[in-house]
Amino acid sequence: MTQLIQELGDCHFYTECFDITDGEKRHSFCEHVYQEFGTVDVLVNNAGANTKKDKITDINLNDLRYMFELNCVSSLGMIQEVYPLMAERKRGLFVNILSSCCLFNNPMTGSYSATKDAMEGISKILTKEAKADNIGVCNVYPGGVDTNFRAKANPNYLRPETVAKMIKNCIEVEDGCVHDIVLRPFIEDNIP
């Protein structure tokens, strides 16, 4: 994050670690941002998690509910928090980090795929609805990324810096130019 902030130069950032599924904490975070900066130009929705791989018939429904809350509802909550300020200014950008699993659905990934597919639907509808307010939406579909998201490191996956660079490019181009970015490591062969 520090490196990205330095690369972007004359920009103002505020970061805070909190439970994104807690609506009061989301609201408090946004209130702090409004007080500090007056508005929000870009929101990157990147919170998410995955559960163990299960067949659809074996999915723990409580785990699935939590996954929907984290991977979908929380991002929508953040959008709802900042949208009014963007709409008032007729300017802004939402960058929603989805997953390449939205482009195909593999066995044993039902919980994760369902929640990311739901967020993709919200994001595509938002793209159409936000157009009237001159607000852009960019959906990022990363494949495997070598982070602690997975239990085991895989140097053949995308580097986090690669994904961050694409997000940065999306933010820097003219408003409304980039709608979807698909990033896949060479190792993945489940292309739709």
Language-model features, listed with the residues they occupy:
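C-terminal helical subdomain
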Residues: 139-140, 154-191
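Active-site-adjacent segment of SDR/Rossmann-fold oxidoreductases
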Residues: 104, 125-135
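Active-site helix of classical SDR
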Residues: 79, 115
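Active-site loop-to-helix junction immediately N-terminal to the catalytic Tyr of the SDR YXXXK motif
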Residues: 59, 105-113, 125, 153-154
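The beta1-alpha1 cofactor-binding region of Rossmann-like NAD(H)/NADP(H)-dependent oxidoreductases
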Residues: 17-28, 61
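Substrate-binding pocket helix/loop in short-chain dehydrogenase/reductase
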Residues: 54-56, 63-65
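Residue(s) in the substrate-gating loop at a strand-loop-helix junction
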Residues: 99
